[in-house]
């Protein structure tokens, strides 16, 4: 049942994507897309570079951070620590970009730092929540068969927390992809190079092209992550 439900949702997603692409081509015209084909490919590559680099940093910091905070000795400090990890979401994205530009300069590096901060909280919080939500009976069973703390974490806690962790990663990725166009304002290449000139010049087709490309990247990455969840946890991933 779960397998057929997943196939049905995937099919409906592909149909919806096809309809959106058809409406896009009809609305702005194939000539605009053809004229911007090189820009779409190049800016898409640059957009993904920003997303992948910043998400890699967020995963390297967020997952260990969530694991550490989920340990019994650290749980009382968890909510205080979450406020620190939340700095990228508390401040407006433009303010984070501006601060990063002041300290680091312009280009990809400040953009990656700002996107890293914006993506951090969902990963930390969902890792923490997923690990704290592992049934106590499983923990007791692992202890009962003589597992060490490391073995228990790797073989019991993380596999059971994975669906919740993946949900946080998907949320963080969507935030990251949607925020990345703002990096254009501090000299980093992304689909913002289509969106913001489209706004300034009242060039509606270029604006829609950049916004739609950004939305499609977010959708495709989310589908890929959902598929990864099905592979790694076929009985629980959604």
Language model region names:
Residues 50, 65-100, 123-133, 140:
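Cytoplasmic-entry segments and transmembrane alpha-helices of multi-pass inner-membrane transporters
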Residues 10, 42-50, 54, 101-122, ...:
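Loop-to-helix entry region at the N-terminal start of transmembrane alpha-helices
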């Amino acid at each position: 049942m779960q397998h057929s439900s997943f196939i049905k949702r995937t099919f409906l997603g592909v149909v919806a994507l096809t309809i959106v692409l058809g409406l896009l081509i009809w609305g702005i015209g194939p000539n605009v897309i053809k004229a911007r084909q090189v820009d779409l490919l190049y800016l898409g590559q640059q957009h993904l570079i920003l997303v992948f680099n910043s998400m890699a940093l967020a995963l390297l910091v967020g997952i260990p951070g969530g694991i550490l905070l989920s340990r019994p000795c650290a749980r009382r400090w968890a909510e205080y620590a979450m406020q620190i990890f939340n700095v990228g979401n508390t401040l407006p994205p433009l303010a984070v970009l501006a601060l990063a530009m002041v300290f680091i300069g312009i280009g990809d590096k400040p953009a990656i730092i700002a996107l890293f901060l914006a993506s951090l909280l969902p990963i930390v919080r969902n890792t923490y929540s997923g690990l704290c939500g592992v049934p106590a009976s499983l923990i007791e069973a692992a202890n009962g068969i003589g597992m060490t703390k490391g073995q228990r974490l790797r073989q019991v806690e993380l596999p059971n927390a994975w669906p919740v962790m993946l949900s946080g990663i998907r949320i963080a990725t969507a935030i990251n992809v949607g925020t990345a166009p703002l990096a254009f304002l501090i000299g980093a290449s992304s689909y913002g190079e289509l969106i913001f000139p489209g706004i300034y010049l009242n060039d509606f087709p270029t604006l829609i092209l950049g916004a739609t490309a950004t939305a499609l990247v977010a959708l495709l990455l989310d589908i890929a992550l959902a598929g990864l969840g099905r592979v790694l946890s076929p009985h629980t991933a959604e």
